[in-house]
Every structure is written in C-alpha cells, then in structure tokens.
UniProtKB/Swiss-Prot annotation:
Family: Belongs to the universal ribosomal protein uL16 family.
Superkingdom in the source lineage: Bacteria
SUPFAM superfamilies registered for this protein in UniProt: Ribosomal protein L16p/L10e (SSF54686)
Protein's name according to its UniProt entry: Large ribosomal subunit protein uL16
Subunit structure as annotated in this protein's UniProt entry: Part of the 50S ribosomal subunit.
Record gene name: rplP
Provenance organism: Chlamydia abortus (strain DSM 27085 / S26/3)
Classification via InterPro entries: Ribosomal_uL16, Ribosomal_uL16_bact-type, Ribosomal_uL16_CS, Ribosomal_uL16_dom, Ribosomal_uL16_sf
Lineage of producing organism: Bacteria, Pseudomonadati, Chlamydiota, Chlamydiia, Chlamydiales
Coiled-coil annotated residue ranges, if any: none
Amino acid sequence: MMPKRTKFRKQQKGQFAGLSKGATFVDFGEFGMQTLERGWVTSRQIEACRIAINRYLKRRGKVWIRIFPDKSVTKKPAETRMGKGKGAPDHWVAVVRPGRILFEVANVSREDAQDALRRAAAKLGIRTRFVKRVERV
C-alpha cells in the first residue's frame, strides 16, 4: 500500500505528541482494534494484519482498514558515509496515535472477531485493545 502520487517525495519525521484527531470510534463494523500507543505502522504490517484477519475469518464477515500509509520513510544505502543529503524513499508508514481505530470487522461473533483481531495485533509493534461499537448521538 502506498499513495498513487504525492506532492513531495521525502517528508520530515514529524511529532508524535497528542491523541488521535480522528477515527477514534468504530463507525463501519461492529468490533474494532484501537491503539493504546503511538508509533509508525508500515504498509507491510498493515498487509500482514489484513491477511491474518482474513485467514482466520475465512469468507465470513467484512473487514475495514481504517489507516493508510501516506508517509514516506527514507533510508541511505549500506556502508555510506554520513552527509551527502537525505536517502531515497524506502517504505511507507501510517502515523498512529493513541485512540486510533486500525481495523473493524462485522457480521461475525464477538469471539471470532476478538480472536481475529488478536492475531492481527501480534503483527504490530504497538499495544492495542479490542473495542465494540457504541451508539453516538
């Protein structure tokens, strides 16, 4: 997963401070996975989570991915001296802050949703929790 095109190839690292500004409630499915820590989730981690959820649920249920990796991370080649500019874009990450909903599932039982999201959480480098949908006014 990566953006089709961006205005600039390289980005600054940015700040992690604060809580998630959006996507803090389960809006599409019945159950979701919410972050408890801040960090970067790579496109490979998102794909590994998606595969883990789909393999556990087989053809039952529906899955929503609520994050998208839109930040490029650069890397310099191995055995390169310091300086000489910033490295080339290497991979893409999604910046997540506490409270962000990462994945949602619907049309499955609570136990199946919990097991599927627990398997997906093992692929991430941040702590998460299982949440269910609450009605908002």
